[in-house]
A protein has these predicted regions:
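NAD(P)+-binding Rossmann beta1-loop-alpha1 motif at the extreme N-terminus of oxidoreductases
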Residues: 1-62
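Rossmann-like NAD(P)-binding element
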Residues: 57-92
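Rossmann-fold dinucleotide-binding core
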Residues: 110-142
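Short beta->alpha hinge that forms the Motif I/post-I loop of the SAM-binding pocket
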Residues: 36, 71, 96-98
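Structural detector of well-ordered beta-strand residues that form the stable sheet scaffold
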Residues: 32, 54, 93-94, 118
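Short, well-ordered alpha-helices that flank and scaffold nucleotide-derived cofactor binding pockets
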Residues: 20, 24, 46, 81, ...
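A short helix->loop->beta-strand "cap" motif at the edges of active sites that frequently abuts
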Residues: 28, 88-91, 113-115
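Conserved short alpha-helix immediately C-terminal to the canonical SAM/SAH-binding motif I
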Residues: 39-40, 75, 100-103
């Protein structure tokens, strides 16, 4: 099986750590990053845990095989709604939210039938935040 094209939506501690872990394990053919802040996008690219950045959510997910939603739970509904039409058939989507009922409601309301959603939670973190805070080892032994 070919390595997947992965998109990270949100590149704070968890998103950047996922990117670092994917890079360390050589697990993706390409990693695209997206955040609302242009500063965060540029930092992510310069740090190197993504291969490219997208200027829009729709552009970020268009070629993705897997999409990680690394954003606060309260933002997931709007993100899923905004990206739904741009998802390619067969895409797998997962989240890192701490609760699932509102996430599942958003997914049920907006995600197209040709996409698969796997709810998740990394059960990891630190007191730090932002793209500079991420590190591949955050998920080791978890």
């Amino acid at each position: 099986m070919d390595k997947p094209h992965i998109t990270l939506i949100g590149m704070g501690l968890i998103g950047s750590s996922i990117g670092h872990a994917l890079k360390r394990g050589d697990l993706a053919s390409h990693i695209t990053g997206y955040a609302r802040s242009a500063t965060t996008r540029e930092k992510a690219l310069s740090i190197g845990f993504v291969d490219s950045i997208a200027d829009s959510l729709q552009q970020a997910v268009a070629d993705a095989d897997i999409v990680f939603l690394n954003v606060p739970v309260g933002m997931i509904a709007d993100i899923v709604k905004d990206m739904a039409a741009s998802l390619k058939p067969g895409v797998l989507i997962t989240d890192v939210g701490s609760v699932k009922k509102s996430v599942m409601n958003a997914v049920d309301a907006y995600l197209p039938e040709n996409a698969t959603f796997i709810p998740a939670h990394p059960i990891a973190g630190t007191e730090l935040s932002g793209p500079e805070a991420g590190f591949a080892e955050l998920f080791d032994n978890r």
